[in-house]
């Protein structure tokens, strides 16, 4: 399959035309309108420093269904002991920067370039991007962030500096989405970590069918408030 080049027009090629590795197109911009249109069509931006802006729609797609998150006994004990205090949308900028910084310090490099960080902070200010924070004694110990549209939460990244802090944040997100009757959490691509917590791969065509139906629901904009496990 060819890789398409985007013009200034606010349009994407069909995600079914993506290459076998999931790469669909390059170019365009990171305006809020384009990013939201991408998610509505099962597409997301992902590129490294020095690369052109790349857009992806992998097949299969990893998802977690709200209410089916797998919580280990050790994690449940931490939750029961209130090791972490959970908040939502209280430190979005700190969470997204921590996700980028942790990968850089680990030597993995990061796709969270400054342009991406600024774009998602802009989406947070518009009420579409959300963060979940896990605090320990007033210190931000872990968290995650993503985009909410309709009944879908499109997860982007998470970080952890203390044991099970990001897992606790994910468990809190799952509980919140169950209460709000969300349909799925998009995890994009398979990782052993997410599979161990209940992530399942589904064909892209099934993923697109699910999100297109779920996007008929009203988008619940932020700030979100966590009401407990």
Swiss-Prot record:
EC number(s) reported in the record: 2.3.2.6
The record, for Gene3D superfamilies, names: Leucyl/phenylalanyl-tRNA-protein transferase, C-terminal domain, Leucyl/phenylalanyl-tRNA-protein transferase, N-terminal domain
| Cell compartment(s), UniProt | Cytoplasm
Q: Which reaction does it catalyse?
A: N-terminal L-lysyl-[protein] + L-leucyl-tRNA(Leu) = N-terminal L-leucyl-L-lysyl-[protein] + tRNA(Leu) + H(+); N-terminal L-arginyl-[protein] + L-leucyl-tRNA(Leu) = N-terminal L-leucyl-L-arginyl-[protein] + tRNA(Leu) + H(+); L-phenylalanyl-tRNA(Phe) + an N-terminal L-alpha-aminoacyl-[protein] = an N-terminal L-phenylalanyl-L-alpha-aminoacyl-[protein] + tRNA(Phe)
Question: Its Gene Ontology molecular function terms?
Answer: leucyl-tRNA--protein transferase activity
GO terms in the biological process aspect are: protein catabolic process
Described function: Functions in the N-end rule pathway of protein degradation where it conjugates Leu, Phe and, less efficiently, Met from aminoacyl-tRNAs to the N-termini of proteins containing an N-terminal arginine or lysine.
Q: What is this protein called?
A: Leucyl/phenylalanyl-tRNA--protein transferase
